[in-house]
C-alpha cells in the first residue's frame, strides 16, 4: 500500500512538472532583431518601447491563455551580424517569429533566411519595397511604409508643382536608391516631361555634405529629390540650412519631417522642405492618437516616434492573429495575419493578404516653425491614404514573377 501511495505521489509530481514545462513552452516568444548601438539605436530603442507599451496591455488579458514574451538581439546595422543573430533567435531561442530591422539590406537577408526556416518575420522600420514586392513571400510581412509608397507620395506631390529639371542626391545603399527610383518612377509616370539633369551619391553617414550641396546648387535644378535617412538625414538638413539651399531650390525628402531628426537640430533645421512621414505625435489630432501619445509619454518621458508607432501596431497584429489562429502555430498564425485589421493611433490598419504589406497612410507636409512648439514641425499636412499609394495586387504578382 505504501509502495502504491509513493508511486502515485511520484506520478502526480511528474505530471505537475510536465504540465508546468508544457505551459512554459507554450508562451508566445518573439525575437526582436534591431539596431541598439550607434546612431540608428535611437530608432531601435523607440520601437522597443512602443512594442513594450502594447505588450503591457495585451498581457493583462493574455493571448490563448498565455503571454507574449520577447528577447532582443543587436544587428549593429550590419548584414552579417543581423543574419547571425536571426539564426541564433531561430535555432537557440526557438522563437515563434522575428520582428524588427532598420537596415534594408539586413531585412532582405533575414527575409531570405526565414523563408527556408518557415519562421514568420515582420519588418517594422526597414523601408525597401522589395520586402513585400519582388522579394516577398509567405513568411515575411511589413508594418512599415515602404519606398514604393513613399516614392508614389513624393511623385504625386511633385507632379502638381511646376518643376521640370530635377536633381537626385542621396545615400549610396539599398534604401537610398530604392526611394530615389520610386520617387522618380512615379513622378515620370505622372508628368512625362520632367528631366533628370544629374545625380549625386555619397556613402552612408558621410559627415560633410556641403560640397555636394554646393555642386547641386550650381547646376540650378528646378527641384531636388533627396534620398537619405538616419544620420545622413541630419547631415543633409544641416547642410541645406547652412547653405540656404531650401530658400533657393524646392526640396522633397521622405521623412524630412521626422520629429526625431528635427527636434535635435533645433535652429539648424531648415524651413520650407517638403517631406512625407508615416507618423507624427501631433497629427492626426484624434482621441486615439492623443491616448497613445499620453500613454507613451507617461511611460518613457518623451513622445513616440514613428518606430514606436509601427512596433505598437505590430504587437497588436501579433496578438490578434494568434488569437484568431487558436494555437501557437506558425502556419496558422500566417493565415490569420493575412487580412487582419487593427485599430491604431492613425486609424484602422489592415495587413493586406496579397503581399503582406500593412495598409497605412502617409502625411505630406512642409517644415516650419510655429509658436506652439520650440522646434520645427510639419505643417499644412495632407493625408495620403495607404490604398492610394500602394501597388495593386496584380502589380505585386507580376513583380514576383507571376503571370
Where are the regions that the model predicts?
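Extracellular/periplasmic periplasmic-binding protein-like sensory domains
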Residues: 237-312, 322-328, 367, 371, ...
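Periplasmic-binding protein-like
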Residues: 89-102, 122-124, 167-170, 220-230, ...
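Beta-alpha junction/loop-to-helix N-cap segments that form part of ligand/metal-binding clefts
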Residues: 42-47, 61-133, 143, 201-209, ...
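Extracellular/periplasmic Venus flytrap/periplasmic-binding protein
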Residues: 84, 129-132, 137-243, 282-291
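Short, polar/charged alpha-helical segment
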Residues: 43-64, 182-189
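Extracytoplasmic "Venus flytrap"
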Residues: 31-52, 73-80, 102-103, 169-177, ...
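Sec/Tat signal peptide C-region and signal peptidase I cleavage site
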Residues: 18-24
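Bacterial N-terminal signal peptides
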Residues: 8-18
Amino acid at each position: 500500500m505504501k509502495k502504491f501511495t509513493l508511486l502515485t505521489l511520484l506520478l502526480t509530481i511528474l505530471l505537475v512538472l510536465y504540465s508546468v514545462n508544457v505551459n512554459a513552452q507554450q508562451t508566445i516568444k518573439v525575437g526582436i532583431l534591431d539596431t541598439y548601438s550607434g546612431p540608428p539605436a535611437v530608432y531601435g530603442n523607440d520601437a522597443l518601447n512602443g512594442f513594450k507599451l502594447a505588450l503591457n496591455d495585451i498581457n493583462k488579458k493574455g493571448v490563448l491563455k498565455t503571454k507574449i514574451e520577447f528577447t532582443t538581439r543587436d544587428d549593429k546595422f550590419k548584414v552579417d551580424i543581423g543574419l547571425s543573430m536571426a539564426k541564433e533567435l531561430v535555432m537557440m531561442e526557438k522563437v515563434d517569429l522575428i520582428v524588427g530591422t532598420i537596415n534594408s539590406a539586413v531585412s532582405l537577408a533575414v527575409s531570405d533566411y526565414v523563408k527556408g526556416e518557415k519562421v514568420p518575420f515582420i519588418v517594422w522600420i526597414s523601408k525597401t519595397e522589395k520586402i513585400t514586392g519582388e522579394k516577398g513571400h509567405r513568411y515575411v510581412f511589413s508594418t512599415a511604409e515602404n519606398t514604393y509608397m513613399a516614392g508614389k507620395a513624393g511623385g504625386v506631390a511633385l507632379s502638381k508643382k511646376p518643376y521640370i529639371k530635377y536633381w537626385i542626391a542621396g545615400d549610396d545603399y539599398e534604401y537610398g536608391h530604392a526611394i530615389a527610383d520610386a520617387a522618380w518612377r512615379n513622378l515620370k509616370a505622372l508628368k512625362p516631361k520632367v528631366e533628370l539633369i544629374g545625380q549625386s551619391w555619397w556613402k552612408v553617414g558621410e559627415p560633410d555634405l556641403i560640397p555636394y550641396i554646393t555642386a547641386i546648387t550650381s547646376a540650378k535644378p528646378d527641384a531636388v529629390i533627396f534620398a537619405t535617412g538616419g544620420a545622413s538625414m541630419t547631415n543633409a538638413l544641416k547642410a541645406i540650412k547652412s547653405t540656404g539651399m531650401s530658400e533657393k531650390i524646392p526640396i522633397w525628402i521622405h521623412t524630412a519631417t521626422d520629429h526625431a531628426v528635427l527636434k535635435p537640430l533645433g535652429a539648424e533645421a531648415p524651413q520650407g522642405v517638403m517631406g512625407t512621414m508615416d507618423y507624427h505625435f501631433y497629427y492626426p489630432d484624434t482621441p486615439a492618437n492623443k491616448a497613445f501619445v499620453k500613454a507613451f509619454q507617461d511611460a518613457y518621458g518623451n513622445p513616440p516616434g514613428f518606430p514606436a508607432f509601427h512596433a505598437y501596431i505590430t504587437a497588436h497584429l501579433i496578438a490578434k492573429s494568434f488569437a484568431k489562429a487558436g494555437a501557437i502555430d506558425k502556419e496558422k498564425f500566417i493565415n490569420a495575419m493575412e487580412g487582419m485589421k487593427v485599430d491604431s493611433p492613425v486609424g484602422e490598419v489592415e495587413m493586406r493578404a496579397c503581399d503582406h504589406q500593412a495598409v497605412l497612410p502617409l502625411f505630406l507636409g512642409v517644415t516650419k516653425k510655429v509658436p506652439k512648439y520650440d522646434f520645427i514641425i510639419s505643417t499644412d499636412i495632407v493625408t495620403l491614404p495607404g490604398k492610394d499609394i500602394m501597388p495593386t495586387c496584380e502589380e505585386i504578382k507580376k513583380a514576383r514573377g507571376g503571370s
